[in-house]
Amino acid sequence: MAMWSLRRKSSRSVQLRVDSPKEQSYDILSAGGEHVALLPKSVRSLARTILTAATISQAAMKAGKPPSSRLWGEIFDRMTVTLNEYDISASPFHPTDPTRKIVGRALRCIERAPLTHEEMDTRFTIMMYWCCLGHAGYCTVSRLYEKNVRLMDIVGSATGCGISPLPEIESYWKPLCRAVATKGNAAIGDDAELAHYLTNLRESPTGDGESYL
């Protein structure tokens, strides 16, 4: 199924709604178009494609059908192209770049088609999280990521994607992401204490006698 057919099918499926909270899956659909509009232009198209695929997959789940391996192949290919473009881009450094690279490496390793809708749902959520790192500090659906166990395994205990005041972004997340960048694959949660220390060191008087290392 080509991407044009994916878009055509979405026009018939977009009005689907979950009948019961107990049946709810594909939670990223709750984000909706308003949230996508807040994303950077560079990832909006990808985010819309992910939501369309989630809508189609949710309809298949409610009809008792398995997740589509062909649909997953399309989305995986689209995500891979985006990751490749991101890797070679010359855009200015963003404080979440280290996190995006960690998540991107994880996404490249899941080409195998998902066997269950739960697995498909998790993959779509991680992909959307990668998109949402483009507006980290202002994301209104960070709760969806914070409860995703697989995502927490990748990035640690802090997603860095919630709504934060600008001063906190400057004083906390930037030092945190720089600390992650210097350690490579380290989980963000492991570096939180180091980032906190670096921030305090910058703001504290010199020679207070405290040693971290």
From Swiss-Prot:
Protein family according to the UniProt entry: Belongs to the herpesviridae US10 family.
Q: One MF term in GO for this entry?
A: zinc ion binding
Q: Does the keyword Nucleotide-binding feature in the UniProt annotation?
A: no
Q: Where in the cell is it found?
A: Virion tegument; Host nucleus matrix
Give the induction text: Expressed late in the infection cycle.
* PTM note: Phosphorylated.
| Record protein name field | Virion protein US10 homolog
- Give the InterPro entries listed for this entry: EHV_Unk (IPR000714)
